[in-house]
């Protein structure tokens, strides 16, 4: 299991992660997973992301730059990841109140892909810190 450390700003953290994957010959072919429907969806929701969660947009821009990929394609892939997935048992919840917007999700973890998993320490300049598990590409 890999242990990544996300730090600094959202954009810098995203760039560092995307670049680290790229330098380790993990260049994600986002276009392979896109459809016209997913691209259309992402173009509609980008304004919502920019209004309510601009930090994630900055993080995705950084990640796309680190991967040497087009932001629009990376965003379309990520924004539609759970919207257009029909056969998983994952769950998501989001809550908004005077303290901010809180989003959590679980992605079912298969132990057979443990070597492709990342234990993430997410400690950016602003916001809450977290430790979580994610599947690598």
Language-model segments: residues:
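N-terminal mature-domain region immediately after signal-peptide cleavage
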Residues: 1-137
């Amino acid at each position: 299991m890999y242990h990544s450390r996300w730090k600094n700003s959202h954009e810098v953290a995203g760039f560092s992660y995307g670049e680290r994957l790229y330098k380790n010959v993990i260049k994600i072919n986002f276009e392979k997973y896109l459809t016209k429907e997913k691209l259309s969806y992402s173009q509609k929701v980008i304004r919502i992301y920019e209004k309510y969660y601009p930090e994630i947009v900055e993080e995705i821009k950084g990640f796309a730059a680190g991967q040497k990929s087009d932001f629009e394609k990376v965003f379309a892939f990520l924004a539609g990841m759970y919207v257009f997935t029909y056969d998983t048992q994952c769950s998501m919840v989001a809550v908004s109140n005077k303290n901010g917007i809180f989003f959590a999700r679980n992605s079912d973890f298969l132990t057979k892909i443990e070597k492709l998993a990342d234990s993430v320490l997410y400690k950016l300049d602003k916001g809450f810190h977290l430790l979580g598990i994610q599947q690598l590409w």
